Design a protein with these regions (language model features):
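Conserved helix-loop functional segments at active or binding sites
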Residues: 97-99, 144-148
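Short strand-loop junctions, especially beta-strand C-caps/beta-turns
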Residues: 11, 124-128
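Short mixed-charge
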Residues: 146-161
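N-terminal module-boundary/linker segments of secreted carbohydrate-active enzymes
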Residues: 2-14
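Active-site-adjacent substrate/metal-binding segments within catalytic domains
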Residues: 19-125
Length: 171
């Protein structure tokens, strides 16, 4: 029988682990978004419809970053459908989960939720059917102060006048 020996030195550091490795994601699967972090009209929710109990737990866990939309939902996600007044957002078939997505929780709500949860934002983009131009347009919407098509769209649709400063996009 061969023997092996290992020495562990708790003071020997090879590098720092990026805190974002401990991040998470949220997607419209089951009750993860609707009823999980967002529930309009519930006594458990704040004035924006965000579940206060969930926000408190996410802050307590110190989740460093959350990707939205996570999982398979991104395969049919059109971020443009998820911005602006909720009553004007189109309802679309969500083919991955076989439901109708009303887009009441979208990009703008996620950005607000992330601020309240004290976590960073990572947006996922649908490169499978939409391509890299979608990522460029999303960055323009989120990060430009104004004077461009998508930044002016943000300024005309919602209360977020300052850019989000979106730094990370996943594909």
């Amino acid at each position: 029988m061969k023997k092996a020996q290992i020495v562990i030195d708790k003071y020997f550091l090879t590098g720092k682990v990026d805190k974002r490795i401990f991040g998470s994601f949220i997607e419209q699967l089951g009750r993860a978004v609707y009823q999980g972090i967002y529930q309009e009209g519930s006594p458990l929710s704040d004035e924006q419809g965000f579940r206060k109990d969930t926000l408190e737990l996410v802050r307590e866990l110190q989740v460093p970053i959350v990707r939205y939309p996570g999982g398979n939902f991104v395969s049919g996600f059109k971020w443009e459908d998820s911005v602006g007044p909720k009553e004007l957002r189109p309802a679309r078939p969500e083919l991955a989960w076989g439901v109708i997505e009303n887009n009441h929780f979208g990009l703008d709500e996620f950005v607000d939720w992330a601020k309240k949860a004290d976590t960073d934002v990572m947006m996922a983009v649908n490169l499978g059917t939409r391509g890299p131009e979608e990522a460029r347009n999303l960055l323009e919407y989120c990060n430009f102060k104004g004077g461009t098509y998508y930044s002016d769209m943000r300024l005309s649709l919602i209360h977020i006048s300052e850019p989000t400063r979106l730094q990370l996009i996943s594909y």
